[in-house]
Amino acid sequence: FFSFSGLMLFFPLLLPVLVFDSIGSRTLLFKQERIGRNQKPFILIKFRTMLPGTPSIASHLSSASAVTSVGKILRRTKLDELPQLWNVLKGEMSLVGPRPCLTNQNELIQERETLGVYDIRPGITGLAQIQGIDMSNPQLLAEVDARMLTTLNLKNYFRYIFLTLMGKGLGDKINLN
């Protein structure tokens, strides 16, 4: 219900983003295999923020020059995440949970497996995101994800959503080299 409502609520934002995003990269949506609940892979959907052909690596390892001008705005405002509401509708993700990692982030996958993080669906936002922790420190990220799982209740669920909407957190870092 929340993801459908979110799609309807943010539809007026989605249309201009689709238009401007297509100008910057010619491809509107970005699809990538990620690790979901119980380590089951799924296809995550986002607005494209990087140039087509950019290697499929974690954002903190990507070059800043690979991010389109529109992509910088989408990342800063977190609007690039809106298409993931479709993943939520399909039951592959939740609004709140650990961010789904790439299939090649072996260290993070192992850390999360050890701490039981894969027991729940990944989310669009979570504790690590509002604290500004990205995937560049797999052990810290997995520990914060595990802590979120032990403290996740209805109040915190909506608190994380609210803080994300208010711009808390830095989003994924990119390599400035």
Predicted regions and their residues:
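Alpha-helical membrane and juxtamembrane elements of multi-pass inner-membrane transport
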Residues: A64-G71, L152, N156
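Hydrophobic structural segments characteristic of membrane proteins
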Residues: P83-N177
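Short, glycine-rich, amphipathic interfacial segments at transmembrane boundaries or analogous
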Residues: L28-A66, I124-E143
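Short, well-ordered beta-strand elements within core beta-sheets of diverse protein domains
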Residues: V70-T77, A146-T150
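Short acidic-aromatic low-complexity motifs
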Residues: R75-L85
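A hydrophobic, helix-centered structural microdomain
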Residues: F1-P52, R159-N177
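Conserved catalytic core of Hanks-type protein kinase domains
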Residues: S22-I23, R76, V88, I133
